[in-house]
Amino acid sequence: MRQRIESQEQFRALQAEYMAAREAEKRKILVCCGTGCVAGGNLNVYHELKKRMDELGVPCEVSLTEHHDDSVGLKKSGCHGFCEMGPLVRIEPEGWLYTKCQVSDVEEIIQKTILGGQFIERLGYKQGGELYERQEDIPFYKRQTRRVLEHCGHIDAESIEEYLSIGGYGALAKALFEMQPDEIVQVVSDSGLRGRGGAGFPTGKKWAQVAAHTEEPVKYIVCNGDEGDPGAFMDRSCMEGDPHKVIEGMIVAGVATGSTEGYIYVRAEYPMAVHRLTVAIEQAKELGLLGDNILGSGFNFHMHINCGAGAFVCGEGSAMTASIEGNRGMPRTKPPRSVDKGLYGKPTCLNNVETFANVPDIIKKGADWFKSVGTEGSSGTKAFALTGNVVNTGLIEVPMGTTMREVVYEIGGGIKNGKAFKAVQIGGPSGGCLTEAHMDLPMDFDSLKKAGAIIGSGGLVVMDEDTCMVSIAQFFMNFICNESCGKCTPCREGTTRMLDILTRITKGNGRPGDIEELRSLAKMIQNSSLCGLGKTAPNPVLSTLANFEDEYREHIFDKKCRTGSCRSLTTYVIDPAVCKGCTKCARNCPAGAITGELKKPHHIDPEKCIKCGACKAGCPFGAIKEA
């Protein structure tokens, strides 16, 4: 049981104690225990490291509270970000990064690295024929500016002592004892911090609106951890890797706005994030950093976790508060806004995970420090989940204004298998697809809005030349239809109609006028829908129409999909000059559509062919083509 801190002086003393303990660790092994690396078996690597070090008599500590001289710190850290190369293990103080680690590598890591001080080349990262020993030298990391993610991968996410050792909760102490609430709001406003979960509303302005309700004795802070975009995992990694940072940001928001209760809304599909947040909240309560009379200041703040059922629409503010209240997650008409009447009808400050995680550093280091990177209208950094047909997938953080080209080619390592770049889908189902023409566009709120996309929560899906853009539009529209709450007719019926048209087109049944109808429906949905989900639902269709209308026309008029992705528009033929008559294709065909004699060219009956592609995939001579 941790002893409760009753004053600022006790807090500073405890913080200094853990800072000293951290500095005294001569060597550290940081085993990535984010969701991806855990799925890859890194927990087994961690347990084997602990077991073998104990057997070999190597002094090993897993907590700063059990510190002894000349020990090796063994930590279960959060996500390191380089998911493509996981499971990952980092060795300090050298900063060495080992990739694709397995239990079978543990003995060599202990003998050669921990005891021998040598780098194991076969576990190092290689790119372009060059071996990289230090994590910071790897191009994936070198081009980044990690602020929100600074300590993800460097501390034990389930230890409040580790968070205190890096200056954690220092911003809270400063906010409580050295600043007035209006000063906190002003610093956040001056920093230019904008919401990192969607449209980029100024955070300081929102806080000021909640703080202005001085007549209300009850106000709430709500953290939106309902990360629903396909392929996005920024908030999850932040909650898993540095949960105390999010909690501290929320408490500071409570001090600034006069709110005394907070809710973190996390989707139940994030069990590790829920667990680590729960542990962090209990630890903060034990130390007196949450609850009544925090640090003896007289300020009270209580925090709860609410697990959502995974509905995408619950990422919308009013739908989220309805869900927390126990009602069906459905958006409501605005005004009133949540800052006036939100959770339980009270003024509510609602920001997303990354927004709150930026707050502690802004309070400690100041608005000018935060604005030292980024663009004039979009200061600071932004975390992105880089996925798709790119060499290096993972979690990245770059200054606002970084170009797409830098992200895809310098950080991501370019397109897989040497193929040509085609598009990037940014902003999830509410975002849009950008092309080669947009590669040098600064990624900030205003520039992307002009290009017909949004930053959103930060999902980046890279697509190569083999991606069908009509299918991409259909995928996102199908997602929107499934996730629509059904409350308003434009979204419920309009998106269904758009999906019907897109499905027809991909099946080869497109008609003249479909493109015009898609645009007309999109405009109607944007102008008439009740909430942000509906208003932005047509974005993937509109952006693909704007940038790839020729593909739509090929599907509709030529009955052709240039990538071969739309099976209904694909015809398989056998090249008689290449076919050896081995009969493998005929034996593999589930529809019996292929005939021919042994050692003679075969033939595919297009009437029987179900276009599964099994023949082409199995042909050892490459004789089967897509026509």
Briefly describe each language-model feature range.
Residues G249-I251, G401-K416:
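Short amphipathic, charge-patterned alpha-helical segments
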Residues G380-N392, V398, M404, R562-I610, ...:
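C-terminal accessory/binding modules appended to enzymatic or scaffolding proteins
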Residues G124-D190, G345, N351-G366:
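Flexible inter-domain linker/hinge segments
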Residues A173-E215, K371-S372, G377, A385, ...:
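Accessory "access/gating" subregions that flank catalytic or transport cores
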Residues V274-M400, G412:
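Hydrophobic alpha-helical positions that pack around
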Residues R2-R27, L43-L74, M85-P87, E92-Y125, ...:
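Ferredoxin-type iron-sulfur electron-transfer modules in oxidoreductases and energy-metabolism complexes
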Residues C33-G41, E84, V188-V210, A253, ...:
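Conserved phosphate/anionic-ligand binding catalytic regions in large, soluble enzymes, centered on
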Residues C32, I155-G170, C223-D235, S338-L343, ...:
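Gly-rich Lys/Arg/Thr-decorated short loops/hinges at beta-loop-alpha junctions or inter-strand turns
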